[in-house]
A protein has these predicted regions:
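Conserved acidic donor-binding segment of nucleotide-sugar-dependent glycosyltransferases
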Residues: 247-259, 266-273
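Short hydrophobic beta-strand element within catalytic cores of glycosyltransferases
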Residues: 232-235
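Extended catalytic core of nucleotide-activated donor transferases of GT-like folds
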Residues: 44-115, 124
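Short alpha-helical segment that forms part of, or immediately flanks, the ligand-binding pocket
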Residues: 200, 223-228, 242-243
């Protein structure tokens, strides 16, 4: 029997973590026993050689017709409407990666009453989505898998004491860097967007990684990446990192204040025993955040209830 079709959209004009995760789910759907994923690039979408679709030689379809099911994320609901497709007649998988849809003033809020099976990237986000009282359909949680390049910068090359990932909060990052430099620590500050490979290479040179999220994140990947490249982590709470980031167990979780962050970094730099204990625990747990685990969880949903709806 021919597989049913599920439509994915690519409408981003630049690379982001959310964009990469959409690509991962497309690849997962290729392993489905019941569905064939189709990809459509909207006008203006990034098709440059560096994006994951191009790197894996995945070409989009030229013309959109109504599929058997939809995989939607972010504002894809609006895009589908602009394409003139009757989305209400087909089952929808809706990937939710942030808290925007829980804000009554955000356009994503108005999509919650639409029927869909929603996949949230953390338990905290799933709880917030349910608490809106607006959601129509099941709400599932699949924590993201992490994919790191096979080759990273050797740790023996020009190591530093502290790496600060501050692209989401440059002001606090610069203040933390200043506070640490006064304590004779070698600091590398990353307060802007850089190539992912370069970011991981710079991260992998550090003994301690400070990661500065937004106040709320659906899921926060940088602490897991840091653990996998061998850096102990200091990171404030952002709700979506609570599954992995547990104070004194896998990392240190200070208040989101410059002084508190500096104190935690100094503590790890001065206490090798603590730093290595946290790093070992974090690295062991980080290794469970695999794309294979994410894929298995997704296919249980896609080839389960959703598949049953389409083939009735």
């Amino acid at each position: 029997m021919a597989r049913k079709t599920i439509l994915f959209l690519s409408d981003s004009d630049q690379f982001s973590g959310g964009y990469l995760k959409r690509f991962h789910y497309f690849c997962h759907a290729r392993q489905s026993r019941g569905f064939e994923p189709l990809l459509y690039f909207t006008p203006g979408a990034d098709r440059k050689p560096g994006n994951p679709w191009a790197a894996h030689h995945i070409r989009g379809i030229d013309r959109v017709t109504e599929p058997d099911a939809y995989f939607l994320a972010g504002l894809d609901w609006q895009t589908v409407e602009r394409l003139g497709l009757e989305i209400g007649r087909r089952p929808v998988l809706n990937l939710i990666q942030d808290f925007w849809c829980t804000d009554r003033n955000d356009p994503r809020w108005h999509f919650l009453p639409r029927p869909a099976t929603r996949i949230c990237v953390s338990a905290g986000l799933a709880e917030a989505v349910r608490d809106t009282g607006q959601v129509n359909g099941p709400v599932e949680t699949i924590e993201p898998g992490v994919a790191l390049p096979d080759v990273l910068w050797p740790r023996s090359v020009a190591p530093v004491d502290v790496f600060i990932g501050a692209s989401k909060n440059p002001a606090v990052g610069r203040a933390v860097a200043f506070g640490l430099s006064r304590r004779d620590l070698a600091v590398e500050l990353c307060d802007g967007e850089i190539d992912r490979g370069e970011y991981l290479a710079r991260l992998g040179r550090a003994k301690v990684a400070v990661q500065l999220p937004l106040a709320q994140e659906g899921f926060y990947m940088p602490p897991i990446e840091a653990a996998l490249v061998g850096a102990a982590v200091v990171v404030p709470d952002c709700i979506g990192n609570r599954g992995f980031c547990r104070h004194e167990q896998t990392c240190l979780v200070p208040a989101y204040e410059v002084g508190a962050i500096v104190d935690c970094v100094r503590r790890l730099c001065e206490d090798d025993g603590l730093r290595m204990r946290l790093l070992r625990a974090a690295e062991a747990e980080a290794r469970t955040y695999t794309l294979a685990r994410e894929c298995d969880a997704f296919l249980r949903i896609l080839d389960g209830a959703i598949f049953a709806q389409v083939t009735r």
